Design a protein with these regions (language model features):
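Acidic/His-leaning functional-site neighborhoods
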Residues: 43-46, 50-57, 61-68
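Ligand-binding loop in jelly-roll beta-barrel domains
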Residues: 39, 99-120
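Glycine- and acidic-residue-biased ligand/ion/polar-headgroup-sensing regions
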Residues: 59-60, 69-84
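Residue-level marker of beta-strand positions
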Residues: 63, 93-94, 112
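A short, N-terminal "cap"/entry segment at the start of jelly-roll beta-barrel domains
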Residues: 1-50
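Short acidic-glycine-tyrosine-enriched beta hairpin
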Residues: 84-104
Length: 120
């Protein structure tokens, strides 16, 4: 099962610093189409080991097909409301999904979420 939310073009993100602090002004990163109507991502961080952090904007009424990720998925709802097969979530809610968990995703009124993917 493929991941429908991968960016459709190259990812320019922040690198993890060897020491000190790294900084990325997210306004310098463009929103990218994902190949799933109504879902756009803004990649922020990606490591060689497979860790990735991104913002995802979900348009009102958008719903994904069933899919799974081969990583742990953490979702923090920043704005609006978000739903999957199990629950509905509001701003401030945190969702953690196991690798391989098949699910859909969507929003009735629109949402902005922070996604973090980590190797299992």
């Amino acid at each position: 099962m493929s991941d429908p939310f991968q960016p459709t073009r190259g990812v320019t993100t922040l690198d993890r610093p060897a020491s000190g602090t790294a900084y990325l002004n997210q306004s310098s990163v463009d929103w990218q189409e994902t190949g799933t109507t109504g879902f756009e991502t803004k990649p922020l961080y990606q490591s060689a080991s497979g860790e990735m952090t991104m913002l995802m904007k979900i348009a009102p009424g958008a719903v994904s097909e069933a899919h799974a990720h081969d990583t742990v998925e953490e979702i923090y709802v920043l704005e609006g409301s978000f739903f999957d097969d199990e629950n509905s979530y509001e701003a401030g809610d945190l969702i953690i999904r196991a690798p391989g968990a098949v699910h859909t995703a969507g929003s009735k009124s629109g949402a902005l979420v922070l996604l973090k993917f980590s190797p299992a």
